[in-house]
């Protein structure tokens, strides 16, 4: 990712090490965002403060990068067909889907990352990206924003993820959770026994056993 980014912007006269430090500075600012402005605005404020205001004229080039060259990072990302299988089955059963990925990227980049995983971005009701979110994981404000936008109570939702710190923290709000352990991220070495957890195949079996909301809705209509 960073090597592709540097390669893209060296022709514009940017120092690659300075650029990468600037990206990290902007990313840190987003991670500490307080809900007052979007992550996008927070990133560009911090990035421009670090790099100089002239960097703002290259904003369209960054958009192009995330739409095109960013895809070169696909080879570094794991893939399982079960990601598509599970999301499609949930959709077919009538569940609303939200791609609750850490909103540190623009929409174009996040949609590409979903495609790398074999998942159609259009299957989701909405996707959390830096244009619309004002918090990042693991700030609980991030999950509160999702609940507000989805108009759902915590008990009506399930957060599925592989990061113990960033995804399972949703349980603090009363959101049910499922920790996928195939590519487990547990930077703080937390005890995962308190969370429902299993492999992607285990999760697929879990999804198969979930009731169909379509059938429940049809039954209520008949009554």
Model-found features: residue ranges?
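Active-site neighborhood of HAD-like aspartate-dependent phosphohydrolases
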Residues: 1-21
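A metal-dependent, Asp-based hydrolase signature
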Residues: 14-67
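Short amphipathic alpha-helical segments at helix boundaries and their inter-helical linkers
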Residues: 27-41, 70-78, 133-142, 171-176
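Short, contiguous strand/loop micro-motifs
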Residues: 31, 72-74, 97-98, 129-130, ...
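Asp-based, Mg2+/Mn2+-dependent phosphohydrolase catalytic module
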Residues: 84, 88, 104-105, 110-223
